[in-house]
């Protein structure tokens, strides 16, 4: 599945959750509901996949993205009235640290669902990607990280 179709499906799942619940719940509630919708859509995902962050070759800690969908898209969820630059920076860092082609920052906290698409300019195929009409943000922060394989369950219905 190409990235355009994949992000379209993910956003559709998020819209269904937001249309059903509305705003006002804690982020973890939206995360659990989105996991249900991703499974129903037949999308493979890992939840809260951990990565080790290195600084100058030294392990300095770990980070966890809310979802890695189909091993290609980082999905970071928020449940805030307004997104701020710090949330966008966090999503940018995840896209680069996890070495994925793109990420989605999805906010369930406002009356209308908000999402931003974030491309990783360091990912080789992104040089040819086009903006699909969703807010395109280029991640450009230098970051060094290595992946730790997640032991979280991946959707067994996935064709991967």
How would you label these PLM feature ranges?
Residues 22, 45, 67-83, 94:
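Conserved catalytic cores of phosphodiester-cleaving nucleases, focusing on short active-site segments
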Residues 78-127, 133, 147:
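Nucleic-acid nuclease catalytic cores
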Residues 1-2, 56, 68, 121-160:
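Intrinsic disorder/low-complexity segments
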Residues 41-57:
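A short acidic/basic microdomain associated with nuclease active sites
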Residues 59-64:
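A short, glycine/Asx- and small/polar-enriched loop/turn
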Residues 1-42, 113, 119-124, 129, ...:
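Solvent-exposed, charged helical/coil patches
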